Amino acid sequence: SFIDAMTSVKLRTGTTHKIFKWFWDVFTPLDRSMHAADMYLDVLQQLGVQDLSNNGLEIFPGEEHFLEAELFWQEQNITDQDKLIGFNIGSAVPTKRWPPERFAEVADIFAARGYKTVFFGGPMDEEMVAEATGYMQTRPIIATGHFAIGGLAAAMRRCCLIITNDSGPMHVAISQKVPIVAMYGPSNPKLYGPYTKEAVIVTAQPPCQGCADGMKHSCDDLQCMTRMTVEQVVK
């Protein structure tokens, strides 16, 4: 806020805590009772934008992305009759990661029910995915590190469900209107949750109140993640 105030722009606007409102020409107060996306849309309303209707996050893969995804599925011998469930087990914030062995157990359960399971994620997730799949009794498809955002969106569109941590790829799945099951621990799903009706949010029961005043980036306990059970996710 201070740096912005030092610039010579004619109009400064944004959303932040009220103690910083003096740095803005048009100020939208931070409201943690509403979703962050709606809060940012309020900034536009303060600027006079009348039509705030939206379809949520949308990513539009190009033809090359659909071709990339289709070639990948062909290489994995996936047909139109196969039912795919995707898994995204990574997150840039370590405290948001559900244990890999539980993802493995969930994947095995769905594989036993006739689904093909596929693990997504970026290059940074490859070690985690290797650990998770090492626990599995069935053989999944590994797409980790294979796709950039456009290809990932096209590939995720082929899935009937994505099971995911709170992460960037979760929002990519949402952008393709794929139903998701999302695990939420230290971050507040009311503020940062999936911006879609096609989502089931799983939280620890009973919930941990350790991050009531803000998300922790390190924690010696992580009850918010470890209390979430395989049964909750599968259900």
Predicted regions and their residues:
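Catalytic machinery of carbohydrate-active enzymes
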Residues: 1-235
